[in-house]
């Protein structure tokens, strides 16, 4: 299976390393060449320097053969646009996008993107933890 990961920060690099360890063919794009260091000296996947909206770079990185695309840059707008490009321009069936803004996350879920919203996950986890305290004190 082949995955293209766009964004190699803390999340993107961890996803890339875990998928590579599980036997996936992993190709990574990041604007910062130094991000390759997050993958370690023994990285055996591909790494491409550039912007995830660059159509030629997406092709070079293998988007046309990708079974999945994971978009984890540091900007919601970029992640949304790149995710939509992967779906509409390249026909990638499994596109997972990190969106930090819960309102945007809900909206783009209805547009066919698989959305991960860590902000919403944190809100739900924290609220559940507080309610558990309430129940323990009753």
PLM segments and residue spans:
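Cytosolic regulatory regions of ion transport systems
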Residues: 1-138
